């Protein structure tokens, strides 16, 4: 599929949010900086991500690779 994460990993890769809490603002409140994220989709440089307690859109540039695995 056309979908790729910031690191060209397959959909469903687990990622870390950037450590800057201001830049992490789209999902601040329920998800701490450094939380493991699941990328649901990507559009125009933004990624729709989900954690255990929150979801939201974050800039692709704010996401750094932590651990990747294929989606189940």
Indicate where each model-derived feature is located.
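Extracellular/periplasmic catalytic domains that process cell-envelope and extracellular macromolecules
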Residues: 2, 8-9, 31, 41
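Boundary regions of SH3-family modules and the immediately adjacent low-complexity/disordered segments
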Residues: 1-5, 36-38, 50-72
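Short, basic/aromatic beta-hairpin or loop at an interaction surface
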Residues: 7-17
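Short aromatic-glycine-enriched beta-strand elements
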Residues: 44-48
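SH3/SH3-like (including bacterial SH3b) beta-barrel domains
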Residues: 19-42
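Active-site/binding-pocket entry motifs
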Residues: 14-16, 23, 64
């Amino acid at each position: 599929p056309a979908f790729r994460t910031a690191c060209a990993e397959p959909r469903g890769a687990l990622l870390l949010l950037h450590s800057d809490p201001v830049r992490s603002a789209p999902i601040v409140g329920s998800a701490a900086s450094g939380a493991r994220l699941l990328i649901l989709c990507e559009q125009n440089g933004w990624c729709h991500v989900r954690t255990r307690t929150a979801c939201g859109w974050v800039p692709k540039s704010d996401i750094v690779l932590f651990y990747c695995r294929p989606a189940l």
